[in-house]
Structures are given as structure tokens and as C-alpha cells.
Amino acid sequence: MTEASLPGRAAPFLGFAGFGVFWGVWGACLPLLRAHAGVGDARFGVALLLVGAGALPAMLLTGRLVDAVGLRVAGMLLTLLGVAGVVLCAVSSGYAGLCAGILAVGAASGATDVAINTLAATAEKRTGRPVVARSHAAFSATVAASSLAAGALAAATGSLLAAFAAAAVVVVALGTVVAAATRSTTVRDGAAPDGDQAAAAQEPAGHRDEQADGAAVRAEGGGRLPGRGALLVVGGVGALAFAAENAFQTWAAVLLTDAFAASPALAAVAPAAFATTAALARLAGGPVMLRRPIATLVTAGLIATAGGVLTAFAPSLQLALAGVVAAALGTATLFPTLLSYGLRPVPDAFRGRATSAISTVAYLGFLAGPAYFGLLADAGGVQRAFLGVAALTGLLLAAVPVLPRLGRPEPITPRRTRPDARPSASNGP
């Protein structure tokens, strides 16, 4: 995977796009899956908890696998996720099969999540471009697009298998491209194939000196995984971000229905507006998120908190929707910024394990967010429960000043590459 290779440069974005395709189809097809299994809401809700039960241990283990085998694992795991969706359709006619299939999907999803985030963070560090933010934007965009496509396909065919088979074709194809583009690339910046080393010898002397200086810095700090506690703190702050983001994404349509008597079609505007705003914010804000991470976290936290308060007290549907959009604008940039910032000082040989640590802790917030909101909604109503979401982003704001004290992240600077020379693997995707 080299910077001169189009598939190599595109690999992180293709990986996240495939991940988004799967989860867009998943969200749109949950009613069909429930009907196919022949279970009620309560039993189906319990079965869905197995997504997290499968994901968490897989997330913990995958980082070490990526560090040992290389970045091609990301494409392999994405392919496995696409296949897992089809297997779920085949085995979910009974409750036991449904639970086993969902557990397998959760494990494949959690493993893929860590692998593609490691791929994006590695590409970002090597190129100096906002790859993490833009990869997450690709995820948001493809979730929205694939959910609409899957909904249309499900309405036309009524077939759960047709929807997941179509998703598998796309996801497996993207996974294959990602695996091929990264087949000779490890997480270590200095692990260049012989051919790339020869090409690197043709680089200008100043560029080679820059690479040598970077290799020396990595060698000094590459003996062990630094600051495991610091990574867990970053993950904890990420859990607050995920809890807030998922609460809005899950409950925004319910808010418009319960508080403002919106029709189903109008209520569906809320999650669609949230996803669209999130994708645009990540795409447009990538450079600022990369260069000014702490300022980004503070600004995004303030916007998200203001959005939560506005949503909680909005007297009209229009203002409530404005609050949801503001919250999307704020929450969308929080976790990508945290992940990029937290992984920046990590030695290349440990980036997979560091990604596992941050992502696994943050995922706990993703799992807890809807339940936390549900308890608040039961106590005080859906609209006022958004004050509790604003409290989460307010707590995140209070935690931001701690982050710079956890370590000294390396500055990200774009690396120049001659257009007529094939760069070394140290110049990345």
C-alpha cells in the first residue's frame, strides 16, 4: 500500500464504506429479521444485546492480530462481516439460531471496527491527511444511502435474504479490494518491501533525512505500549461521545412522534438529518480536527451541549429538529478527533492494540447510551431526557483539559512525495 497507489490511498475509505453498507442494511432490515425469526419484541430485544456481547471480546483481541499480521486483516474481516449477514439469514428461523447468528455478526463487526480504525489511523499518521475523520464521514454517508436502498429492496421483495445478499456482494467486494491494497503493509512505518526501499533511495536527500529522523523517534519509543491508562482515559471520554451520539440517533424520531405528533414519514426526517449532518461535519471538518484537536473537542462539545438543551426545551417541531442537527454537528466530530489524537503518540508496532483499548472502552458508551436515555425518558418524558444527553457532553467538556496532560502527541505534517517515484511503505497509503 503506497501513496502512489489509488487503491492504497482509498483503502481506509473503502473499508469504512463497506462497514456503513452493512450497518445501513442491518438497521433497515431489523423488522424483517424479527418476523423471520418469529419472536416478539422482548425476546428480539434480548437477542440484539448479543451484538455487544460478541463485539466486545472481538475488539479486545483484534488489535493484537493487526499488529502481528498486518493491515490486510481489515479487508479480510470486512469480507467476513458481509458473509456473516448472509449466514444470519440462513440460521435465524428459530430463536437459538437467531441468537447465534447475531452473536457472530457482533464479533465480526467488533473485529472489523478495530481493524479499519487502525488502518485509518496508520494512513493518517503516514500521510498527514485527515483520514480518520473522512473515513468516518464515508461510514455515515453509506449508512444513510444503504439503509434507503435496503428499505426499498425489502419493500419490493419482502425478502431478508435478498437484502443481506445484496449487501454481502458490495461488502465482500470492498473487503477484497482493501485486503489486496494492504496485502504487503504492516502497521510499522518502517516495514518497507525491498522494492520500496530501492525507490526510497531515489528520494531527495532532505526527504530521506526526514524519514530517518522519524524512524529514530519510533525506535526510541517503540519498545512497549505507552500509557495504557492514558488510552483508557481517551476511550472513556469517547464513551461519553458515543453515548450522546447514539442517544440522538436512536431517539430523535421518537421525540418528533411523542412530543410533536409527527407522522412516521416526518419523524424519519430526524435520524436522516442527523446522519447527513454527521457525514458533512466529518468531511468538512477533517483538517481542523487533525490540526487543532483540543479546540475541536471544546467547540464540538459546546455545540452538542447547546443542541441537547435546545432539543429538550424546543416549543416547536422545527426548533427540535434544529437542536437535533446542532447535536449532530457537535457529536459527529468528537470520537474521530479523540481517536486521531489518542493514537498519535503510539508507536507503530502497537497501534492495533492501542486502537483496541480506545475503541473497546468507547463502545461501552455506544451500548449504554440508548438504555441511559430510556431510563431518563421513563422518568421525565422523551423531550426532557435530552437534558441528560446534554449533561454527557457537558461532562465531556469538563474532561477535555485532562487530555493534553496524558502525553505529548506528535505533530501531524504532510509528507511530500515525488509524483514520478514510488514511495516507500513508510510513506503509507
Residue ranges of each PLM-predicted region?
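Primarily marks hydrophobic transmembrane alpha-helices of the MFS/SLC 12-helix fold
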Residues: R72-G75, T79, L297-V298
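Interfacial helix-cap and linker-helix signal at transmembrane-aqueous boundaries
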Residues: L33-R34, L65-V66, A152-T157, L256-T257, ...
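Short amphipathic helix-loop junctions that connect adjacent transmembrane helices
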Residues: A28-A42, T250-L266
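Helix-breaking motifs and short loop linkers at transmembrane-helix boundaries and internal kinks
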Residues: G38, G70, V91-A96, A261, ...
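C-terminal transmembrane helical hairpin of 12-TM major facilitator-type secondary transporters
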Residues: A295-L338
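Helix-loop-helix hairpin linking two adjacent transmembrane segments in secondary transporters
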Residues: S135-T186
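Helix-to-loop junctions at the C-terminal end of transmembrane segments
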Residues: P57-L71, A154, A281-P293, A377-D378
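Intracellular juxtamembrane helix-capping segments at the cytosolic ends
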Residues: A111-K125, T333-V346
